[in-house]
């Protein structure tokens, strides 16, 4: 059974989310501010976090920043704000997905399932038989061990970042449009996906490139999309 932590200062929202997730067979833990969420993550084995932006003591943005220092579990941000700038901020600080309040509970459950599928797949550690190892120059992705390294140095990616990089590195030289990347990774129609994909691409570059502004591996093809450059 997956443990999901729901953090929101509105107890009615937390209780409502708990009802829907419990019906799907998940075990729900509850917190009502960012500090409580961090403390619970230190004590419990949590597979996914749903966290609100506006909260007392420690808001969702600062809490997510602190959590990302130690954990790569999927994080879904809840916020009453709907502007692109707020979505980008949530993704910039390490969130994997973003849901605007008021939200459709069934949509939230679907997003939870989607994130957990990726997280579970990323956590599988089958025997390393070398068949699923992809190397481009000094960039190495071992999909059996779910590990990434650059010039022998390990790189820590979030589940979304890993899956984007894996898609590209399995097809060096092939250009993927933003829509292709989004639909392959998120398994949903790419409506307004430009900013979402761009933010994750930037995060990947910051982790695998010596100079992200002059990338060696992850290249943009202006007006078309992104690719892993053949070496």
PLM features: what roles do these ranges have?
Residues 53-55:
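Receiver (REC) domain active-site loop signature in two-component systems and cognate sites
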Residues 3, 114-175, 179:
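Short, Lys/Arg-enriched segments at the junction into DNA-binding effector domains
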Residues 65, 69, 73-134:
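Basic, amphipathic DNA-recognition helix from helix-turn-helix-like DNA-binding domains
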Residues 25-32, 40:
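Short hydrophobic/Thr-rich beta-strand motif most characteristic of the beta2 strand and flanking loop
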Residues 15-23:
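Charged docking surfaces used in two-component/phosphorelay signaling
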Residues 32-36, 59-62, 86:
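Acidic catalytic/metal-coordinating carboxylates
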Residues 147-217, 221-224:
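Positively charged, aromatic-enriched patches within helix-turn-helix-type DNA-binding elements
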């Amino acid at each position: 059974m997956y443990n999901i932590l729901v953090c929101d200062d509105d107890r009615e929202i937390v209780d409502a989310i708990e009802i829907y997730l419990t019906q799907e067979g998940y075990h729900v833990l509850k917190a009502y501010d960012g500090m409580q969420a961090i403390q619970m993550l230190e004590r419990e084995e949590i597979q996914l976090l749903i966290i609100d932006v506006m909260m007392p003591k420690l808001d969702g943005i600062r809490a997510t920043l602190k959590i990302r220092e130690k954990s790569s579990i999927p994080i879904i941000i809840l916020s009453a704000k709907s502007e692109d700038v707020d979505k980008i901020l949530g993704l910039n600080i390490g969130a994997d997905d973003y849901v605007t309040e008021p939200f459709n509970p069934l949509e939230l459950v679907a997003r939870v399932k989607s994130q957990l599928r990726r997280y579970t797949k990323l956590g599988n550690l089958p025997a390393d038989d070398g068949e699923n190892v992809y190397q481009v120059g000094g960039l190495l992705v071992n999909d059996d061990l779910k590990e990434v390294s650059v010039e022998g140095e390990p790189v820590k990616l979030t589940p979304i970042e890993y899956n984007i990089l894996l898609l590209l590195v399995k097809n060096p030289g092939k250009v993927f449009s933003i829509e292709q990347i989004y639909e392959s990774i998120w398994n949903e129609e790419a409506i307004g996906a430009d900013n979402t994909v761009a933010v994750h691409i930037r995060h990947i570059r910051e982790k695998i490139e010596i100079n992200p502004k002059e990338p060696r591996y992850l290249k943009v093809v202006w007006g078309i999309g992104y690719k892993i450059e053949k070496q």
